[in-house]
């Protein structure tokens, strides 16, 4: 019994790509979003839809708050939208995530990925 448990643990811990990207990564978010996108209008009834939306909204709010804090403190800002709360549509965000190379996307947080998408949309002219 003990050997079976150890073998199962070794198999699952040795092959994380087979299980998908770890939670919280940009790749995990994109995988879940693409799964919902494939459902078409029925995606709105999937329980993961609300979680994805809340996750993206929370990350966006955090980035906006960071930008406001940077402006107030006189630090350089990381993206240059006309307002601190940048506009980013859901499909625009998903397409931006897909444009990030898979190797990088698998190792970056959703916040880092969203910042990269915002920097591409709203580059700073320095």
Give the predicted meaning of each segment.
Residues 7-8, 17-18:
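Cleavable N-terminal signal peptides
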Residues 1-4:
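Positively charged n-region of N-terminal signal peptides that target proteins for export
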Residues 21-96, 117:
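Short N-proximal segments of mature Sec-exported proteins
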Residues 9-10, 39:
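Enrichment for repetitive, rod-forming helical segments
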Residues 58, 62, 98-109:
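Short, highly charge-biased, low-complexity peptide segments
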Residues 13-15:
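N-terminal signal peptide c-region/cleavage motif recognized by signal peptidases
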Residues 104-126:
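C-terminal partner/receptor-binding element of secreted or periplasmic proteins
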